[in-house]
A protein has these predicted regions:
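Feature captures the catalytic ectodomains and active-site-proximal regions of enzymes
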Residues: 1-134
C-alpha cells in the first residue's frame, strides 16, 4: 500500500532533506479464532479481548487475570473489579447466544488482548543517506 499512498511521495521528498523521520503507529490487532466462555454481570464491558468487572466467571487456565488492578496501574471502578485478558488468538464469548456469536466473531481482527501484536508499538527512525560530493 505504501507505493500508492501519499506517504511514499513524502518519504521521497524528505530523502533530499537533512532530517530524521520517526514513523510509528498504534498497537496492532490479531485474528481471533478460539472462543473462551466467560460470564459477567450487565456492567461488564463488551470488548472481545479483555473484560473488567465484578464477579467474572471464567476458566483461569484459559486467561490472564489481574485481581488487584492497582498493582498493574489499571483503574478500578469498584473494590471488587478484576481484569481478564485473552491471549493468543482467543476471544471472549458469553454462554447465552454462544452459537450465534462464535461464528460471527471467529476469524475477525480484534484488539485489547495481550498478544505481542497488540502490545508492541512499531517505531522506526529514517535518516537520509549522505550523498557524495554534495
Amino acid at each position: 500500500w505504501l507505493r500508492h499512498s501519499g506517504m511514499s511521495e513524502l518519504f521521497r521528498v524528505l530523502s533530499h532533506v537533512d532530517c530524521h523521520v520517526i514513523v510509528t503507529t498504534d498497537h496492532g490487532s490479531i485474528r481471533t479464532n478460539r472462543p473462551i466462555k466467560i460470564v459477567g454481570d450487565r456492567n461488564t464491558n463488551t470488548n472481545l479481548r479483555y473484560k473488567l468487572g465484578k464477579n467474572l466467571n471464567y476458566n483461569p487456565r484459559e486467561v490472564f487475570v489481574i485481581k488487584t488492578p492497582a498493582e498493574a496501574q489499571l483503574p478500578a471502578p469498584n473494590l471488587s473489579t478484576s481484569y481478564v485478558f485473552a491471549s493468543g488468538a482467543a476471544f471472549f464469548a458469553y454462554p447465552n447466544n454462544y452459537n450465534y456469536y462464535v461464528p460471527y466473531y471467529k476469524d475477525t481482527f480484534q484488539h485489547g488482548g495481550i498478544s505481542m501484536e497488540e502490545m508492541l508499538i512499531p517505531l522506526v527512525t529514517l535518516t537520509p543517506r549522505r550523498r557524495m560530493g554534495g
